[in-house]
């Protein structure tokens, strides 16, 4: 069974919509400890560390009975938006969100989501989680933004939605109407590439 090592509601909803059985446990890994400058590699490393931090503490988690035996998969993800070579995480305030959207209006950027799937077996008797395989990949999607007036940007920023999203926008939320088109995996822009997960979870 699957453990989602993330507090993301978007990823949770994607899994629920696909009727994938899982439980959600947020990773407590400190992201500031990673100094990788390459955005593509950074997303991948953060996804691994999130999944790995859970795998190392699996014996201390309160898991349902069905997780006490057999195969377990721990999924870690991290999304970073890249705009003209610069990494855009979550805006720190409304002013920063507005400035970013002014720059992104009529332009495009890349949403990189690092994926790590740690597969193993947990023996509840010995309290040992034995890793059998680690699968990692960063999936990238190109996001095109509409040309927006200042009042549209302000109206969106005032909803506070941009403050909780990598890149300052949510495709599945209010921000979806400001996205012109997507090239690449659609669900990846929401934080999880479902085609990648299907390929690696059920092989």
From Swiss-Prot:
Entry's EC annotation: 3.6.1.9
Gene Ontology CC terms, in alphabetical order: cytoplasm
Residue positions of the active site: 78
Gene Ontology MF, one: nucleoside triphosphate diphosphatase activity
Localization (cell): Cytoplasm
Keyword Secreted belongs to the record: no
Enzyme class: hydrolase
Catalytic activity, reaction form: a ribonucleoside 5'-triphosphate + H2O = a ribonucleoside 5'-phosphate + diphosphate + H(+); a 2'-deoxyribonucleoside 5'-triphosphate + H2O = a 2'-deoxyribonucleoside 5'-phosphate + diphosphate + H(+)
The entry's keywords: Cytoplasm, Hydrolase, Nucleotide metabolism
Required co-factors: a divalent metal cation
Presence of keyword Cytoplasm: yes
One GO process term, biological-process aspect: nucleotide metabolic process
Family of the protein in this entry: Belongs to the Maf family.
HAMAP family (alphabetical): Maf (MF_00528)
Role this protein plays: Nucleoside triphosphate pyrophosphatase. May have a dual role in cell division arrest and in preventing the incorporation of modified nucleotides into cellular nucleic acids.
Entry protein name: Nucleoside triphosphate pyrophosphatase
